[in-house]
Swiss-Prot record:
A motif (QWRF motif) lies at residues 468-471. It comes from the Eukaryota. It comes from Arabidopsis thaliana. Residues 42-72, 345-359, 401-418 have a biased composition (Low complexity). The gene is QWRF2. Belongs to the QWRF family. This is QWRF motif-containing protein 2. Residues 90-102, 206-216, 291-303 have a biased composition (Polar residues).
Length: 659
């Protein structure tokens, strides 16, 4: 259920303002209880106090947790302390957490709570956290929209509320100037019931603690220096921006249509009662008007209240952020409509179709709040058109705590009425089954089983742990991605260098292969060089023989002199050649027949040549013999002559006388 009341501040969970250096004007703080008369709102006895009272609240920067005493009053007024870890934990007992408190930061509060005391203590931890821690805190603050579920009711029994005096020992907190209302005294009357939920107490040191996600809120924005109470209404107003033509439909669901954003936070339609009752109640939200003409620069902030049409649960909301302008006419119109809506005799409350009122507002972001069993976080992180600053996401426990405030916390006492329909809401809250969102207040009274509360608490813790791991995994994934990109870049460079080396190696291999082929060719030609050198000598004889062969062929084929132009009929030439071939074939038969005779003649001629050679030898021998015969004939003649002469000598001697 949406809590949209910012006219009064919950004394059990007061907001922590920023340091004086971080305020709007950077100087003196403005009083928190300043009453400004409205120029537009019509006077109404039911909410004359709340409609003309504005408070100046600031958003917080870091989350914190504080411990409380056994009484609920001390628990609700305890101071929060920053935690370095986004996943906060709470102490199990109130007594253990009280022992860890810092006396300097948590001074004793006197019995008079109406006295305004300047507080010089300011806790600023925005600069102590690193960027990674801030990112981690931011990542654990928002619940996913997948957590949306149907609302359900628990089989519990309402106990009659008793009235008791408020606890005297209250811890003072910075900038706390309002007294404890009567409606808070009813809750402070049963300190024993508050001992049932171990996570109700807060630890006051800087260790990692988990705030009670059912009753407290977290805000980890780095631009806020003080710690403040977490309410959905204030976070909604802090996240919402000014737009020209938005609309707010109030029909049991707060839907601020602000620019067509698709991120919504639903505060549920249906709060079911027990199965045997079979009754469902719808939540109706109303905006009470701001008493000033505009809300800007943190001066005076408007008030939002969300009243249930059936059970009337009301929880206060955070104030509007700075520089967000909202006309008082808008608040006046909204307030008047919702007073008529809550009036039993008005036609708006009688007809279900008129319960949805479209309101022209100046919000800039779209928010939808659902009162389902699982809380949702508002989609922050979007820059304001007025301030231009980023808004951080809300805590999961903040949405749960603000939407699960008990009916008694939101009920107004007779001495302090918030609006005209508070009595009707008190009656509704006493008679109707509370929502699943009323865990934090009802568990202090012991009205709801601890098993379901523990389940919801563990769900929130596990979801925060899941967000932490998701953040760690995302950071690891980013690191792995960077390493992967670097590795891919290195691999690419290595591949390029390897390709260049391969190209150079390929070129060198080609050159080596060519050199090997050249060497092989040289080795082959080296053996043939002698024959090639001899070929130059043989070429002349070969060319002369070829020229003689060509000339003989020409002489045998071309017997007619060809001079000048010669025209030859190819067909006639063909017939002539064919006839010549026929004649040659006929001659060849005769030539073959004569070849035998020629062979015989050739053999005879060979024999004749042999005989002739022999005759020649014999003739030469005869010539020698003839020459010798002639010489011998001459000798013979001389001899014959001598013989003749010798035969004639004696005759002559006888004839001559002896002397």
């Amino acid at each position: 259920m949406v809590a949209a009341a910012i006219s009064t501040t919950d004394p059990r969970n007061p907001p922590r303002d920023r340091p004086q250096s971080l305020t709007n004007n950077g100087g003196q703080r403005r009083p928190r209880g300043k009453q400004v008369p409205s120029r537009y709102l019509s006077p109404s006895p039911s909410h004359s106090v709340s409609s003309t009272t504005t408070t100046t609240t600031t958003t917080t920067t870091t989350t914190s947790s504080s411990s409380s005493s056994s009484s609920s009053a001390i628990l609700r007024t305890s101071k929060r302390y920053p935690s370095p870890s986004p996943l906060l934990s709470r102490s199990t007992t109130n007594s253990a957490s009280n022992s860890i408190k810092t006396p300097s930061l948590l001074p004793k509060r006197s019995q008079s709570v109406d006295r305004r005391r300047p507080s010089a203590v300011s806790v600023t931890v925005g600069t102590e956290m690193s960027a990674a821690t801030k990112m981690l805190i931011t990542s654990t603050r928002s619940l996913s929209v997948s957590f949306q579920g149907e609302a359900f009711s628990l089989p519990i029994s309402k106990k009659k509320e008793t009235t008791s005096t408020p606890v005297s020992h209250r811890k003072s907190t910075p900038e706390r100037r309002r007294s404890t209302p009567v409606r808070d005294q009813r809750e402070n009357s049963k300190p024993v019931d508050q001992q049932r939920w171990p996570g109700a107490s807060r630890r006051g040191n800087s260790e990692s603690v988990v705030p009670n996600s059912l009753s407290r809120s977290l805000d980890c924005g780095s631009d806020r220096g003080k710690l403040g109470s977490g309410f959905v209404g204030r976070s909604m107003l802090h996240n919402s921006m000014i737009d020209e033509s938005p609309r707010v439909s109030v029909n049991g669901r707060l839907s601020l249509d602000l620019g067509g954003r698709d991120e919504y936070l639903d505060i549920g339609d249906d709060i079911q009662r027990r199965p045997n009752n079979g009754l469902t109640s719808s939540v109706s939200c109303d905006f009470t008007a701001s008493d000033t003409d505009s809300v800007s620069s943190g001066s005076t902030n408007g008030v939002q209240e969300c009243g249930s049409g059936v059970n009337g649960e009301i929880s206060k909301s955070k104030s509007l952020p700075r520089n967000i302008m909202a006309s008082a006419r808008f608040w006046q119109e909204t307030n008047s409509r919702l007073r008529r809506l809550q009036d039993p005799g008005s036609p708006l409350s009688s007809s279900p179709g008129l319960k949805t009122s479209s309101i022209s507002s100046k919000f800039g972001l779209s928010k939808r709040f659902s009162s389902d069993a699982v809380p949702l976080s508002s989609p922050r992180g979007m820059a304001s058109p007025v301030r231009g600053s980023a808004i951080r996401s809300a805590s999961p426990s903040k949405l749960w705590a603000t939407t699960t405030s008990s009916p008694a916390r939101a009920l107004s006492s007779p001495s302090r009425a918030r609006n005209g329909v508070s009595d009707q809401m008190n009656a509704y809250n006493r008679n109707n089954t509370p929502s699943i969102l009323s865990f934090s207040a009802d568990i202090r009274r012991g009205k709801i089983g601890e098993d379901r509360v523990m389940d919801a608490h563990l769900l929130r813790l596990l979801y925060n742990r899941d967000l932490q791991w998701r953040f760690v995994n995302a950071r690891a994934d980013s690191t792995v991605m960077v390493q992967r990109l670097n590795a891919e870049k290195n691999l690419w460079n290595a591949w390029v260098s390897i390709s260049e080396l391969r190209h150079s190696v390929t070129l060198k291999r080609i050159k080596l292969l060519l050199l090997r082929q050249k060497l092989k060719l040289a080795s082959i030609l080296r053996g043939q060089m002698g024959f090639l050198e001899e070929w130059s000598l043989l070429d002349r004889d070969h060319s002369s023989s070829l020229s003689g062969a060509t000339e003989s062929l020409k002489a045998s084929t071309l017997r007619l002199p060809i001079v000048g132009k010669t025209v030859v009929d190819i067909q006639d030439l063909k017939h002539a050649v064919s006839s010549a071939v026929d004649v040659m074939q006929a001659m060849s038969s005769s030539i073959f027949s004569l070849t035998s005779k020629v062979d015989e003649m050739n053999s005879v001629m060979v024999e004749t040549v042999n005989v002739t050679a022999k005759e020649k030898v014999l003739l030469e021998r005869c010539q020698g013999c003839l020459s010798r015969v002639a010489a011998m004939q001459v000798t013979d003649c001389s001899m014959k002559t001598h013989i003749i002469q010798l035969s004639r000598i004696p005759i002559t001697s006888s004839l001559t006388p002896q002397l």
